[in-house]
Amino acid sequence: MVDMDRISISLPTKLLGEFDEIIGDRGYASRSEAIRDSIRDYIIKHKWIHSLEGERSGTITIIYDHHASDLMERITTIQHDYSNLIVATLHMHMDHDNCMEVVIVRGDAKIIRELTDRLTSQKGVKQVKLNVMVPGGNIPE
């Protein structure tokens, strides 16, 4: 038998409700099993992103609450700190409260990861997605 640790987490009611719907749709026997699968997926994604090396191009997509205290200023400051990586940015107002920013990047994978981690850790950022492409010359035909 696998050793198990019991943990406790706090979640917003709406988020838990959506998670419970997914649990039902996917046929999980319990929340615990669904959470274990989610954590496994998170670990796999983290390992994949942190295994990237060399020159890469891609996008970092950020969804954030534009009402969050000085968040837009913090995001802009971080982007300026990595201006050597950033090729372009696109800003979209999703609704009254949320904005999406797409940052096109090109450079060393480790530095792109560092930028992504800094953006992810900002309070008020709801979601960050890194999509990395291999250099064009390395794409099989």
UniProtKB/Swiss-Prot annotation:
The keyword Transcription regulation applies. Gene3D superfamilies: ACT-like. Chain A, domain 2 (3.30.70.1150), Met repressor-like (1.10.1220.10). Binds 1 nickel ion per subunit. One of its GO terms (biological process) is response to nickel cation. One of its GO terms (molecular function) is DNA binding. Keywords: DNA-binding, Metal-binding, Nickel, Transcription, Transcription regulation. NCBIfam families: PRK00630.1, PRK01002.1, PRK02967.1, PRK04460.1. Transcriptional regulator. The keyword DNA-binding applies. Its cofactor is Ni(2+). Ni(2+) binds at H80, H91, H93, C99. CDD domains: RHH_NikR_HicB-like (cd22231). Belongs to the transcriptional regulatory CopG/NikR family. The lineage of its organism: Archaea, Methanobacteriati, Methanobacteriota, Methanomada group, Methanococci. This is Putative nickel-responsive regulator.
